[in-house]
Amino acid sequence: MVLLLFLVLFFVPESVVCQRPNPNGVEFNTSGNMYTSGSAYINNNGLIRLTNSTPQTTGQVFYNDQLRFKNSVNGTVSSFSTTFVFSIEFHNGIYGGYGIAFVICPTRDLSPTFPTTYLGLFNRSNMGDPKNHIVAVELDTKVDQQFEDKDANHVGIDINTLVSDTVALAGYYMDNGTFRSLLLNSGQPMQIWIEYDSKQKQINVTLHPLYVPKPKIPLLSLEKDLSPYLLELMYVGFTSTTGDLTASHYILGWTFKMNGTTPDIDPSRLPKIPRYNQPWIQSPNGILTISLTVSGVIILIILSLSLWLFLKRKKLLEVLEDWEVQFGPHRFAFKDLHIATKGFKDTEVLGKGGFGKVYKGTLPVSNVEIAVKMVSHDSRQGMREFIAEIATIGRLRHPNLVRLQGYCRHKGELYLVYDCMAKGSLDKFLYHQQTGNLDWSQRFKIIKDVASGLYYLHQQWVQVIIHRDIKPANILLDANMNAKLGDFGLAKLCDHGTDPQTSHVAGTLGYISPELSRTGKASTRSDVFAFGIVMLEIACGRKPILPRASQREMVLTDWVLECWENEDIMQVLDHKIGQEYVEEQAALVLKLGLFCSHPVAAIRPNMSSVIQLLDSVAQLPHNLLDIVQTREVHRGTEISGEAADSPESCSIAPLTFTESFVSHGR
């Protein structure tokens, strides 16, 4: 397929022809190829100004021709990549405007749409309508509770609505993982990259200052197939709005490419941003504005003094700790959490873990359901380390991981705010009759969901994350019975290919691997061991150790292995499943569970191999029974963590497993 490449290079003079050959396809520039509407215009230097000093207005610019995003009406969306340089400058020293949105839409005429908070994309009646076929990335500089905004300086990915699928504070990640925030309406030029991978079904958004190289870690990453949302032919462009207060929204340069990485923009060739013209000072409106400003300053001074006196008398002083500088934008007000949980009443307790109680709640105004974990601030140093982990893990976004929304500190207590899982934890379904029974298809899907989340932690994120406490109580189910791995209170981080540091043995009895109990060194293989136990537990409907059971059935793995040796492995299945199960799937789960929970760490598969086996892409070794019967630790294979997570292969004919830490697209 011929690649379509257009370069909207705004520094190219208008006399240049509008189309010319290019080694990568067809190249375009601004001459005659841009469609403007509303307050938008393009000056002689190619600078786009979307909005001006006119209040309650919308400015939009689109590439004049439609682009083919699909090969057919029902086809899949092709990969695409775009980058642009923008600047947002407020007027008269007052923050105004509502930001910029890069938009992919089926028409250049989005009317009737509203300015202000709707960014010229939607109106009240068509918000959330699947017929919109709009995908946008918003650079939002205003807070609007109806769109679940948490701050006035964020970046979000929007699909058919301004309630973002995923959102983050504006900023960028350095190579060492440190987060640096940016102020979108600072007037400084910034560059943003929006890249969609059709194979991974993933869209990444990366923001950075103009003269800083593109970061390796994206600000936003969303796994979503865009094929149901985009049509075969679509327009691409920008939209921006103002309210009663105004701002200038500029696009200095823009490139876009289908099926490849778009070329970078040369900052030295970008047009200059003009200073905002201020003839208003000499006008009656200008005099009135100055008078109101002076009066406002006097009132502000009086209010500031009153506030200072109030804070001086306040007994409780919240000190901003180091870790909060990075995680601060996600801080919740204690008042909101207190209202949401009805004053942290015992009737709202969902459960109690190793770090504290978990409460259910509903946030005021937005009515979003949340789960709040209360953590005692017993050890300052311990809490600092714990939150350093949480701050990093809070950036994770995966459909099979419970999302950490933010935190709150109040009177020495720490509160972690998570998405609320409507169905609760998996152990309640396995062991509490009143919760309801799980059929085989639900159990198999839960196993695959947890495997997907664990694979992301081990091999797909920029760092290796070792969960260290995988068990049914930490597997949560949403309203649609989708499983999500949660409770990262014991999780550890390390770089790909490095050796996790030894620490105290953490986890739950029955799920701790032999090498972890001996050395105290957790690894991805010790997580795989616990996952294998959980697989058996889901299939058999019983705990890994039953002290009061017969000697034969006391240890789950021993019992399953014995039944396999006696060629009657199906007898271990949970009797509540009945006869409604797929025998091949059940056998795979039981045998793979024994494989993953093998006492020798080096023999266990990694999670990418587990995914292949569960998806029937690969087959279990034909001699797997002989392998799992080898219960002793052979010389040279007593693995604690180093060898288990090294990039070397562990070959088990006819299937070869390789621990390969790959950072996809990072």
Swiss-Prot record:
Extracellular-facing ranges: 19-289
Residues the entry annotates as binding ATP: 350-358, 373
UniProt GO MF annotations: ATP binding; carbohydrate binding; protein serine kinase activity; protein serine/threonine kinase activity
Signal sequence, start to end: 1-18
Cytoplasmic side: 311-666
Catalytic class of the enzyme: transferase
GO cellular component terms listed in the entry, alphabetical order: plasma membrane
PROSITE patterns found in the cross-reference section: LECTIN_LEGUME_BETA, PROTEIN_KINASE_ATP, PROTEIN_KINASE_DOM, PROTEIN_KINASE_ST
Active-site residues, record numbering mapped to chain: 469 (proton acceptor)
Region (Legume-lectin like) location: 27-257
Main localization category: membrane
Carbohydrate-modified residues: 29, 74, 123, 176, 204, 259
Membrane topology qualifier: Single-pass type I membrane protein
Keywords annotated in UniProt: ATP-binding, Cell membrane, Glycoprotein, Kinase, Lectin, Membrane, Nucleotide-binding, Receptor, Serine/threonine-protein kinase, Signal, Transferase, Transmembrane, Transmembrane helix
Catalytic activity: L-seryl-[protein] + ATP = O-phospho-L-seryl-[protein] + ADP + H(+); L-threonyl-[protein] + ATP = O-phospho-L-threonyl-[protein] + ADP + H(+)
TM segment ranges: 290-310
InterPro entries linked: ConA-like_dom_sf, Kinase-like_dom_sf, L-type_Lectin-RKs, Legume_lectin_dom, Prot_kinase_dom, Protein_kinase_ATP_BS, Ser/Thr_kinase_AS
All copies of domain Protein kinase, residue ranges: 344-625
Compartments reported by the entry: Cell membrane
EC identifiers of the protein: 2.7.11.1
Family: In the C-terminal section; belongs to the protein kinase superfamily. Ser/Thr protein kinase family. In the N-terminal section; belongs to the leguminous lectin family.
Protein name: Putative L-type lectin-domain containing receptor kinase V.1
Designated gene of the protein: LECRK51
